[in-house]
Amino acid sequence: MQNRTVAIIDDNQDSLKELEKILTMAGYTTILVDDILGAVDIVINNKPDVILMELKMPHKNGFALADAVNRVFETKKIPIIAMSNLFKDEFKWLMDFCGIKRWIKKPFLPLDVIWAVENEIEEDSQWEMERHSAGMEIMA
């Protein structure tokens, strides 16, 4: 696995540290973001491979933040994984609309986090290979 970066966006310092520990032990580089209002700029400047974010945060909820990330050309392809202790069926359409690819229910197991991140990176890499392959066919 090449070195991949995960941006973790959460207003809870304990959650940030726990997720940092899980992902660092799995070989990922992490960017910890507790500044919810500045999170979009941090994502734009760092372009992580995956974003892992809490949905319930003060000032800006995760849906609004995901939507803001997806409206920026440079970051709209970054997979977003939402975390929350509360998920309802009516959230599914909102998650799709905001570009959230996957969700993890809190409390989570470390393997749930690693599995979700690895699957998003794998799906993103597969999409890039298919896009590159299609481009090569067009050029031929």
For every predicted segment, state its role.
Residues 17-25:
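Charged docking surfaces used in two-component/phosphorelay signaling
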Residues 54:
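Active-site residues of response regulator receiver
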Residues 16, 58:
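The feature encodes the CheY-like receiver
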Residues 32-50:
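Acidic, metal-coordinating helix/loop segments flanking the phosphotransfer/catalytic sites
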